[in-house]
Amino acid sequence: MTDTAPQNDPTTSHVLPKGIRFAGVAAGIKASGKPDVSLIVTDRPSVMAGVYTTNQIVAAPVVLTRAKTPTSTGRVVLTNSGNANACTGDEGMQNAKTMCDLAAKLADCDSADVMVMSTGVIGKPLPMEKVRAGIEAAAGKLGDAESDFIASADAICTTDQFRKTVSETVTIRGQQFRIAAMCKGAGMIAPNMATMLGVVMTDAPIGPDAAQASLKQIAGRTFNRVSVDGHTSTNDTVMLVCTGMSVSEDAKEFNSDELKIWQEAATQVALKLAKMLVADGEGAARFFEVRVSGAADDGDAFVIAKTVAASPLVKTAITGGDPNWGRIVSAAGYAGPKIEPERTSLVIDGVTVFENGTPLSIDAAKLSESMKANSEVLADLTVGDGPGKASFWASDLTEAYVRFNSLYTT
C-alpha cells in the first residue's frame, strides 16, 4: 500500500527507553538474505508481560514464552523471522528451548528469563546452525543507538513492505518516561490477539501484574481491532518490557492513576502500529475504517464493526471504490448483535447513503470517484440509539493479495 497516512515515516527519530540494547542481523534463515535474527536485551532484570494467539494450533515459541509471563526477571526478547517454528513437533519445542539457552548464556542470565518469538513459514524445521550463528552475531552487535533499534525492528519482518516502529514520551510524577515499540505483520492479520509480532518497551516502573493487565487492555483497543484477511496465526505475540530505569531501583511502582496515564500513552503508540499493519496489508490498495455507534454496548458494536470489516464483499467493494452500502448494512445485520433496522444509518466518506432504514438519493458516481481517489475510506454506521460504540480497521481485498498468497510457499 502506498501514500497512506498510517505508514511509518523513515525520517522520524525515536526516543528509546533507558536500559535496553538492540541488535538485528542476517543469519541466512531467509532465502532473501535479509535480516532475520533480532535481540532485545535489558541491562537489569525487568518486568515482561505478553499476550498471545488464540489459535488452538500454537507454535513452540508461543507455548514456551506464554508459560514464562508475566515475570519480573526478564532479560531478553529473541526473535527469528523466516521460519515460524510452528507444527514442528518435539523438535520444534527443543529448538525453541535451545534458542533460549543460547541467548541466556550470551546475556549472562537464566534461560527462564529469555522470551522467544518466531515468524515465517509454518511446518519447516529451524536451521539451527544458522540460528545459533545469528544469535551469537547479534549478541556481538548489541547497542542502545537508534540504528540498533532500527536493525532489531528490521530483523523481525517477513512480507512487510516497511518497518513498523513508534516512540513517545509521557510525563508522570513531573518526569518523562519513554515508550518505544516495534511490530511486524502484513498478512494473516485478524488478531484476537493479533497475527503479528510486537514488542512495546518502556522505562517506567510497572509491576508484572499491572503490566499484564495493561497489555491486555492495550491490545484489546488496538491490535485486536485490525484485520487484513481474517486469518489468525499460530505465532501471534505482543510483549511488554518494563525496565523501570527512569527511576531508582527502590522507587515505587505507578499507582492506579499514574498507570492510567501511562497506559493511554502506550495505547496511542500501539494504535499507530496497528494501523500500520493494515496499511501494509499484502496487496492492499486502501485503508478501511468502520465506526459503529448506537449498539447496546461496546462489545456488540465491536462485533458488528469487525463483521463488516471482515466481509469479502465489503472489502472488494472498497477495492473497486464502489459505494455499495447494501453490503455494509447487510453485514451488520448478520453479525449477531441486535440492531434496530428503522434506526440504522450509514455515512460513507461524509456522504449519507442510508438513513433510518431508508436509502437516500445520492450521486453514486461522484462518491465512487472520491473513494477511488483516496487511499482511506471511512464508514460511519449507526445501528440504533444505544450507548455502544467501536472502531475497526481493515484493508481491502485485491487481486494482488490473491496472487501473492497463492504462491507464498512455492
UniProtKB/Swiss-Prot annotation:
Main location: cytoplasm
Pathway: Amino-acid biosynthesis; L-arginine biosynthesis; L-ornithine and N-acetyl-L-glutamate from L-glutamate and N(2)-acetyl-L-ornithine (cyclic): step 1/1; Amino-acid biosynthesis; L-arginine biosynthesis; N(2)-acetyl-L-ornithine from L-glutamate: step 1/4
Site residues, Involved in the stabilization of negative charge on the oxyanion by the formation of the oxyanion hole: 119-120
One GO location term (cellular component): cytoplasm
Broad class of enzyme this protein falls into: transferase
Entry keyword annotation includes Amino-acid biosynthesis: yes
Active site (catalytic residues): 195 (nucleophile)
Family: Belongs to the ArgJ family.
Phylogenetic classification of the source organism: Bacteria, Pseudomonadati, Planctomycetota, Planctomycetia, Pirellulales
Purpose of the protein: Catalyzes two activities which are involved in the cyclic version of arginine biosynthesis: the synthesis of N-acetylglutamate from glutamate and acetyl-CoA as the acetyl donor, and of ornithine by transacetylation between N(2)-acetylornithine and glutamate.
Gene name as annotated: argJ
Catalyses which reaction(s): N(2)-acetyl-L-ornithine + L-glutamate = N-acetyl-L-glutamate + L-ornithine; L-glutamate + acetyl-CoA = N-acetyl-L-glutamate + CoA + H(+)
Enzyme Commission code: 2.3.1.35, 2.3.1.1
Keyword Cytoplasm: yes
GO molecular function, one term: L-glutamate N-acetyltransferase activity
Family annotation (InterPro entries): Arg_biosynth_ArgJ, ArgJ-like_dom_sf, ArgJ_beta_C
Localization per Swiss-Prot or TrEMBL: Cytoplasm
Residues where substrate binds: 158, 184, 195, 282, 405, 410
Subunit structure: Heterotetramer of two alpha and two beta chains.
Alphabetized UniProt keyword annotations: Acyltransferase, Amino-acid biosynthesis, Arginine biosynthesis, Autocatalytic cleavage, Cytoplasm, Multifunctional enzyme, Transferase
Site keyed Cleavage: positions: 194-195
The protein, known as: Arginine biosynthesis bifunctional protein ArgJ
GO biological process, one term: ornithine biosynthetic process
